């Protein structure tokens, strides 16, 4: 049983949602974002610290069928990536989901876009069932799945922040526009340490 606030120093109402930090989205992968390898050490450290302070950690994964509609061979915009059960769909080491973490697989149907961690998944219900009120979004890629997940978290009435020191984009030039859009609609922008501290 997850404890409620203990002495005011735990963040059990908070969930860290780590979006799509998978082999195919990292350097050397089929659809790599920029500078992803530099994301891994601070993200791994922050995941451990968030857990230590009582936050729920959620990992989302693109988990596509081989005939997914988003693939170029099927008329979509993207190269084949994150096919269910393949190495490219695995979390990028050293990240690893623990037994206490929530793993959300998205884009699992042929026509499911799966940009958002909330799109045709159980994420909303998982968070509500665990009493979560705050969501911090990190991961890949800022202008696609991070953006979509943050917007859906806000729409679902979670206190939502994008952790701007723990995100990576396909095109860095898009980041200022995306973050400005998110801020305008009510998503908070925060560095990871400040977000964790604010949940106490």
Say what each PLM segment does.
Residues 1-2:
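Ser/Thr/Pro/Gly-rich low-complexity, intrinsically disordered segments
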Residues 5-108, 124, 129, 133, ...:
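Active-site acidic carboxylates
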Residues 46-47, 147-155:
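Histidine-anchored nucleotide/phosphate-binding helix
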Residues 87, 91, 142-149:
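Catalytic-loop motifs flanking and including active-site residues across diverse enzymes
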Residues 107-118, 149:
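Active-site rim beta-loop-alpha module in soluble metabolic enzymes
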Residues 111-114, 167-171:
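Short, small-residue-enriched loops and turns at beta-alpha junctions
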Residues 120-122:
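A short, well-ordered alpha-helical element
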Residues 132-145, 162-167:
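Glycine-rich anion-binding loop/nest that anchors nucleotide
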